[in-house]
Regions:
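Transmembrane beta-barrel strands of outer-membrane/channel proteins
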Residues: 38-44, 96-100, 141, 153-159, ...
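Extracellular/periplasm-exposed beta-strand and loop segments of Gram-negative cell-envelope proteins
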Residues: 48-76, 100-133, 160-188, 216-221, ...
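Cleavable N-terminal export/targeting peptides
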Residues: 1-34
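Short glycine/proline- and aromatic-enriched beta-strand/turn motifs that initiate or cap beta-hairpins
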Residues: 23-101, 276-278
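Residues on the lipid-exposed face of transmembrane beta-strands in outer-membrane beta-barrel proteins
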Residues: 40-42, 80-84, 137-141, 155-157, ...
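Repeated loop/turn-to-beta-strand initiation elements of outer-membrane beta-barrel proteins
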Residues: 90-94, 147-149, 203-207, 238-242
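Outer-membrane beta-barrel proteins
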Residues: 24-29, 81-88, 140-145, 199-203, ...
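Transmembrane beta-strand segments that form the barrel wall of outer-membrane beta-barrel proteins
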Residues: 206-223
Length: 279
C-alpha cells in the first residue's frame, strides 16, 4: 500500500513539473509554435454506405449495405495524421491524413436488390462488404499566425479507393443457379480546397477546426466531398498531448469507370480519440 502511495505521489509530482515546464516554455499551446505534429488514435465511426452498381443494363437503385446486406453500421477505424510546418516564420504546412474501413456482413433480403446486372431476390441469403481507404495530402499557408491563433487555407488532394461486393444464390423460377458474387471498385484522385483555424486559450489547451471541400466533374467521376474535423487538445507534457475531436467525412458521386457504372453516397462520422506528439 505504501509503495502504491509513493508511486501515485511521484506521478502527481511528475505531472506537476511537466505542467510547470509547459507553462514556462510558452503562455500558449506548443502545437502552435512547433514544426511537427503527429497524431494517432481511434475513430469510432457511424457509417452510411449507399452504393449503386448498374452494370451494362443501366438500371439499379442505391443499395443501403447496412440496412439491406447487414454490413456493420459502426466500427472503430485507425486514424493517423502528420503535419509539418516550414518556410518563413513556419507559415507553410504540409499535412497527411489516413483512415480506412473494411466492413462485411450478411443478411436475408427483405426486398429485391439489383447489383451489376444481377437481381438477388427477396428472401435470398446474401453476404456483402465495403472497403474504403482515404489518404489526404494538403498544402496550406497561414494568413493569421501568432502564439495564440493560426488561421490558414490551401489546396489538397484526396486519394480514394472504394470497393464493394454482394454475393448470394441466384433464383430463377424458384430454382437456384448457384452462388454468384459481383464486385464494383474504383480509385480516384480528388483535388480540394481547405481551411483551418487553431486557437489556444491557455498553455495546455487548443481548440482546432478544419474543413475540406470539392464539387467537381472529372469526366469519369462527378461528385462532392466534405471532410471536416473539430476538437480540443490537452497538452499533458511538453511534447505529448491528448486529443478529442469529431470527424465527418461524406462522399457523394456518380461514376462510369472500368467495371463500375453507378454511384455512391458514403458517410463516416463520429468521435476520434488520439495521442499527439509535437516537436
Amino acid at each position: 500500500m505504501l509503495q502504491h502511495s509513493r508511486f501515485l505521489l511521484s506521478a502527481l509530482l511528475l505531472m506537476s513539473l511537466a505542467g510547470t515546464v509547459t507553462a514556462q516554455d510558452s503562455a500558449y499551446h506548443p502545437v502552435l509554435s512547433d514544426n511537427f505534429i503527429f497524431s494517432a488514435g481511434a475513430f469510432r465511426s457511424d457509417n452510411t454506405l449507399k452504393i449503386r452498381a448498374e452494370g451494362t443494363l443501366g438500371i439499379g437503385d442505391n443499395v443501403d449495405f447496412g440496412e439491406s446486406v447487414g454490413v456493420d453500421r459502426s466500427n472503430t477505424l485507425a486514424y493517423v495524421q502528420l503535419r509539418w510546418k516550414f518556410g518563413s516564420e513556419r507559415k507553410w504546412s504540409l499535412t497527411g491524413q489516413y483512415f480506412a474501413n473494411d466492413a462485411t456482413g450478411d443478411a436475408t433480403l427483405k426486398e429485391d436488390v439489383e447489383w451489376q446486372n444481377i437481381v438477388f431476390r427477396e428472401g435470398t441469403f446474401v453476404d456483402g462488404g465495403v472497403k474504403f481507404e482515404v489518404a489526404r495530402l494538403f498544402l496550406g499557408r497561414s494568413f493569421v499566425k501568432n502564439e495564440q491563433h493560426d488561421f490558414g487555407a490551401g489546396l489538397g488532394i484526396h486519394n480514394l479507393d472504394l470497393s464493394a461486393y454482394i454475393g448470394g444464390e441466384i433464383m430463377i423460377n424458384d430454382d437456384t443457379t448457384g452462388y454468384r458474387r459481383e464486385n464494383a471498385s474504383a480509385s480516384q484522385l480528388l483535388p480540394n480546397l481547405g481551411a483551418w483555424y487553431n486557437f489556444s486559450p491557455a498553455s495546455r489547451w487548443l481548440l482546432h477546426g478544419r474543413l475540406d471541400w470539392i464539387s467537381a466533374d472529372l469526366g469519369k467521376v462527378d461528385g462532392t466531398l466534405w471532410n471536416t474535423n473539430v476538437g480540443v487538445n490537452f497538452q499533458a507534457w511538453r511534447h505529448v498531448g491528448f486529443d478529442l475531436s469529431y470527424q465527418y467525412f461524406n462522399l457523394d458521386f456518380v461514376v462510369d469507370k472500368g467495371d463500375w457504372r453507378g454511384g455512391a453516397d458514403i458517410t463516416y462520422s463520429g468521435p476520434v480519440i488520439s495521442v499527439t506528439v509535437n516537436w
